Amino acid sequence: AAILIVSVGDRDYKTEEGELRTMPGIKNLVRYQQNLAADEAVAFWNMFEAMGGEGSMADMVHAKPSLANYDYTHINFRGGKHLAGLLYESLIYGKEQYDRRRAYYEEEP
C-alpha cells in the first residue's frame, strides 16, 4: 500500500504587538515530517508550502471568500477544497513525470 505523509499546515498566533505570525515550531515540525517520510521511503506533500508558507494562514482567513477560520488554525470547507485541488495537481504531475521517466528507460536498448 502506498503511503503519503501530508505536513502540518500554517498556524498563526498574535504577538503581544497584535501581529500575526506563524507559530514557533511549525517549520521544525514540517522538516521532521519530511525527514521521516524520506527515512521511511514514503511520499511527502508539504501542505505548509502549498498554503503559501509563513504567514499564509492569515492570507487564507482574509481571502475573499475566506478559506480559513478566524482561529488562524483551521481551514474551512473552501480552503479544504482549494488545498485538495493543489494536492490533486501535485499527484497528477508526479504521475506524469513517473510515466515519462519510465517510458524513457523502456526505450533504451
What name fits each language-model region?
Residues 1-11:
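Conserved, well-ordered alpha-helix/loop/beta-strand core segments that scaffold catalytic motifs
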Residues 10-109:
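Catalytic His-Asp segment of secreted/periplasmic serine-dependent ester chemistry enzymes
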